[in-house]
């Protein structure tokens, strides 16, 4: 119940910020690009961002050699977006956004996904869960994904991270069979809320 309250308060706070931004004057201009950054790269990464957060989001670009990143544009809100298209383990078109605090988790995910063997990837995740080295996402953070063969046919997918959550801790089902919001991967650092239609 406590975690549900945290999610509720987070969503309400975000709603208040959005409403407040809509009431004022025009939104501030987007932040400038970092030296050497391409506007096309920034624009592509931002496709996954909600319209109300897109203008001030940070945009990064992965460096696959070590999964560190370069900042293409430093935003003023907490959202960070990246174009993963064609990188190891990713769809030909793949963009995602989440909260800045999830960057260590994103980098760890990218490292894991470089292994083409699905069973080995899952074994690596299971081992990290067991030994405590799996980096947790921020509780209540939203992940926005858009993936597919190309932008025109890409599917949108939105999840809310609730690491460690179970039916006992949140009061939500651990299966989507009944319809409505449910917890996928309960009890793990990967636990997240699935929202039908998102």
Question: What feature does the model see in each segment?
Answer:
Residues 16-17, 77:
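Generic detector of short, well-ordered, non-transmembrane alpha-helical segments enriched
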Residues 24-198:
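Primary mode marks residue(s) on the alpha4-beta5-alpha5 output face of response regulator receiver
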Residues 7-16:
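Bacterial N-terminal signal peptides
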């Amino acid at each position: 119940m406590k975690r549900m309250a945290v999610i509720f308060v987070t969503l309400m706070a975000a709603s208040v910020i959005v409403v407040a931004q809509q009431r004022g004057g025009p939104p501030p201009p987007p932040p400038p690009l970092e030296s050497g950054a391409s506007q096309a790269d920034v624009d592509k990464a931002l496709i996954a961002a909600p319209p109300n957060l897109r203008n001030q989001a940070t945009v990064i670009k992965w460096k696959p050699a070590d999964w560190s990143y370069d900042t293409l544009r430093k935003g003023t809100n907490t959202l960070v977006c990246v174009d993963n298209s064609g990188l190891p383990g990713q769809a030909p078109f793949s963009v995602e956004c989440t909260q800045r605090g999830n960057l260590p988790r994103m980098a760890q995910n990218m490292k894991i996904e470089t292994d083409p063997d699905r069973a080995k990837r899952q074994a690596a995740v299971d081992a990290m869960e067991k030994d405590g080295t799996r980096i947790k996402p921020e509780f209540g953070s939203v992940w926005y994904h858009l993936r597919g063969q190309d932008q025109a046919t890409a599917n949108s997918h939105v999840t809310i991270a609730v690491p460690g959550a179970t039916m006992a801790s949140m009061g939500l089902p651990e299966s989507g069979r009944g319809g409505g919001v449910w917890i996928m991967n309960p009890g793990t650092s990967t636990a997240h809320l699935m929202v039908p239609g998102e």
